[in-house]
Amino acid sequence: MRVRYKPWAEDYLKDHPELVDMEGQHAGEMTEWFDKTQPIHIEIGSGMGQFITTLAAQNPHINYISMEREKSIVYKVLDKVKEMGLTNLKIICNDAIELNEYFKDGEVSRIYLNFSDPWPKNRHAKRRLTYHTFLALYQQILNDEGDLHFKTDNRGLFAYSLESMSQFGMYFTKINLNLHQEDDGSNILTEYEKKFSDKGSRIYRMEAKFHSQK
């Protein structure tokens, strides 16, 4: 996805430190950042925030973190949080490789990866969010009952992710090869999911856990 640069976005985000972490000021203190101590769920690569804000509105008993590195997109998530008055959703503007700088071991209950960049060239495999170095980070911060939810329209990335997770020692509790035909009605659409689905694209989804989180 090509992101149009917004020169004012960084200053706008910095004006809301109670909602947005720009420079790691809450690193290691995620639980304390929220008003209530509740399970923490993360979406990595939140885009414009439709998925994560909908989840937060539906589940006030869960604390959510939107992690998105593109400042020129994050402001849209911030606008939604403010408009909806969500107190259980915070935003980290940083790269996923920094996850263990923000979260303590076992602090997270669920991680969402929705329509991540597939990085189709083999030489870019290390950038895929289901590459083994990222899986190691997820394993570190997830608690013993924690799980990973993954959605994509990219068949190649889905196949790669199944193999990568299996080789890493994960197991699958749910796999959908055509989500919108199989879904039970609980699926929450992302902005891109609706766009892809309207074009007739098949949506793939899985839920996975680590055999041993630690």
Curated annotation (Swiss-Prot):
Keyword line: Methyltransferase, S-adenosyl-L-methionine, Transferase, tRNA processing
Organism: Staphylococcus aureus (strain Mu3 / ATCC 700698)
A GO cellular component entry from the record: tRNA methyltransferase complex
Phylogenetic placement of the source organism: Bacteria, Bacillati, Bacillota, Bacilli, Bacillales
CDD domains in the cross-refs: AdoMet_MTases (cd02440)
Binding site for substrate: K121, D153, T190, E191, Y192, E193
Protein name: tRNA (guanine-N(7)-)-methyltransferase
Function: Catalyzes the formation of N(7)-methylguanine at position 46 (m7G46) in tRNA.
Family recorded in the similarity comment: Belongs to the class I-like SAM-binding methyltransferase superfamily. TrmB family.
Pathway in which the depicted protein is active: tRNA modification; N(7)-methylguanine-tRNA biosynthesis
Recorded GO MF terms: tRNA (guanine(46)-N7)-methyltransferase activity
Reactions this protein catalyses: guanosine(46) in tRNA + S-adenosyl-L-methionine = N(7)-methylguanosine(46) in tRNA + S-adenosyl-L-homocysteine
Active-site residue numbers: D117
Pfam families for this protein: Methyltransf_4 (PF02390)
Binding-site residues for S-adenosyl-L-methionine, renumbered to this chain: E43, E68, D95, D117
EC numbers: 2.1.1.33
Source organism superkingdom: Bacteria
